[in-house]
A protein has these predicted regions:
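A recurrent domain-boundary module in secreted/ectodomain proteins
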Residues: 192-224
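Acidic glycine-/aspartate-rich tracts in secreted/extracellular proteins
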Residues: 4-7, 58-61, 91-93, 118-127, ...
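Active-site-proximal segments of metallohydrolase catalytic domains
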Residues: 1-86
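Terminal peptide-recognition signature
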Residues: 53, 112, 199
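C-terminal outer-membrane/trafficking sorting elements
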Residues: 227-273
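The catalytic-center signature of Zn2+-dependent metalloproteases
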Residues: 96-189
Length: 273
């Protein structure tokens, strides 16, 4: 969704374009300069009503490559003008000069942070295994513990298992969830239920003013809520060898896909009066 009215009440597409005095912004020394007019950037709009996203050329030192970054909710209450996302132009979407290495999903990852999510992999200074996105106070219990970062692609042959999840409250030892949007791997495509619940909790808490904003928006691609949770049951979850699916819908179509998105099983039920 993009705003259709700016803070002054004027019509807008939700996108502004700024001719900057800088060719790029150094992540180490200028990480917030793109957020101010007087430092070569663009002043953000009221962060209690808008989610500001600055798309620019992010420069970094050494071998570090920074695709984007965002502040967790509550961390910028004293400097609200900093709140929002910064995304390198090469990793925003998939059109034009955008890179395919992140599938254009860098904003998805950063919005996860903006809405209270941590990485799925362990970030403790001592290394080793940890259930990171639950360690730091969030209520995400359904992502397996993961030791360090996996930067590779995710496909049918990806079977990383860096931690024994039996030690972290799981009933079985699961593969690392490298396909999660909050991982650093390529070709990610999912949030878990607990991650979704955590983001909703943030929208009802720290970022409730954004959720309740009266700014008009133009939204496309939305899917109406048909209350899937109460009408479809998939168990066991997580599963290894087999799953069962139950539904109360009389008309339905089920497509089961593998990790590459290839359809491997289809079933349809249609009732006629």
């Amino acid at each position: 969704c993009l705003a259709t009215t700016d803070p002054n009440g004027n019509p807008t597409t939700g996108v502004t374009r700024t001719l900057s005095t800088k060719n790029s912004f150094n992540y180490n020394t200028e990480s917030n300069d793109m957020k101010r007019n007087n430092t070569g950037g663009k002043d953000g709009w009221d962060p209690s009503k808008y989610l500001n996203i600055w798309v620019c050329d992010i420069a970094s030192s050494g071998n570090t490559s920074v695709l984007g970054y965002a502040y967790l909710p509550g961390l910028q209450s004293w400097n609200a003008w900093k709140d929002g996302l910064v995304v390198d132009f090469q990793h925003f979407g998939t059109i034009g000069n955008a890179s395919s290495s992140s599938d254009g999903r860098t904003p998805t990852h950063e919005i996860g942070h903006y809405l209270g999510l941590y990485h799925t992999f362990c970030e403790s200074s001592g290394g080793g295994c940890c259930d990171n996105d639950n360690t730091w106070g969030s209520n995400v219990y359904d992502t397996p513990a993961t030791d360090d970062v996996y930067y590779g692609s995710v496909n049918a042959n990806t079977n990383n298992n860096t931690c024994n999840d039996l030690f972290y409250g799981f009933n079985s030892d699961l593969l690392d969830m490298d396909e999660n949007y909050m991982a650093y791997s390529n070709h990610t495509w999912m949030f878990t239920y607990d991650q979704i619940n955590e983001m909703n909790a943030t929208l009802n808490g720290y970022r409730s003013s954004l959720k309740n904003s009266n700014v008009p928006v133009n939204c496309t691609g939305l899917v109406s809520n048909i209350n899937i949770d109460n009408n479809v049951k998939v168990f066991p979850n997580p599963a290894k060898n087999s799953i069962s699916i139950e539904t109360s819908f009389s008309n339905y179509s089920i497509n089961l896909k593998n990790i590459l998105g290839k359809n491997i099983l289809s079933h349809r039920n249609i009732s006629y009066n």
